[in-house]
Amino acid sequence: MALSKAEILDAIASLTVLELSELIKDLEEKFGVSAAAAAVAVAAPAAGGGDAGAAAAEKTEFDVILASAGDNKVNVIKAVRELTSLGLKEAKDLVDAAPKAIKEGVSKADAEAAAKKLEEAGAKAEIK
């Protein structure tokens, strides 16, 4: 019995991320292709689409930038440690090197929460 496209899609949709990753590897081996090369080829025309392509990419992933530590540097270092799980020295170095990215490629909600936490600690934060 042949499976329909809808049945195949339903089966794929029910897979976990790990199972899906393994499926992709198996398909790459079986057909001698690379999913990464296909993703680049598909993404290239979208990126050439101008501002619409850039705006679509920014809507899903955001970077939280520490613009400046402000007056209360100790609290900012504590906030950076909480957000990044860095050690004390690494967090201090990151705060001293501002403007610097604190979190990269996070969701909008996570970016806003991180920026709020930094601002509450006395820092100036930006979401890009």
Swiss-Prot record:
NCBIfam families the record matches: L12
Organism: Methylobacillus flagellatus (strain ATCC 51484 / DSM 6875 / VKM B-1610 / KT)
InterPro entries in alphabetical order: Ribosomal_bL12 (IPR000206), Ribosomal_bL12_C (IPR013823), Ribosomal_bL12_C/ClpS-like (IPR014719), Ribosomal_bL12_oligo (IPR008932), Ribosomal_bL12_oligo_N_sf (IPR036235)
Family annotation (Gene3D superfamilies): 3.30.1390.10, Single helix bin
Name of the protein described by the UniProt record: Large ribosomal subunit protein bL12
The UniProt record lists the keyword Ribosomal protein: yes
Source lineage: Bacteria, Pseudomonadati, Pseudomonadota, Betaproteobacteria, Nitrosomonadales
GO biological-process terms attached to the record: translation
Quaternary structure and interacting proteins, as annotated: Homodimer. Part of the ribosomal stalk of the 50S ribosomal subunit. Forms a multimeric L10(L12)X complex, where L10 forms an elongated spine to which 2 to 4 L12 dimers bind in a sequential fashion. Binds GTP-bound translation factors.
Family recorded in the similarity comment: Belongs to the bacterial ribosomal protein bL12 family.
Keyword line: Ribonucleoprotein, Ribosomal protein
Function noted in UniProt: Forms part of the ribosomal stalk which helps the ribosome interact with GTP-bound translation factors. Is thus essential for accurate translation.
Molecular-function annotations in GO: mRNA binding; structural constituent of ribosome
An example Gene Ontology CC term for this record: cytosolic large ribosomal subunit
Pfam families linked: Ribosomal_L12, Ribosomal_L12_N
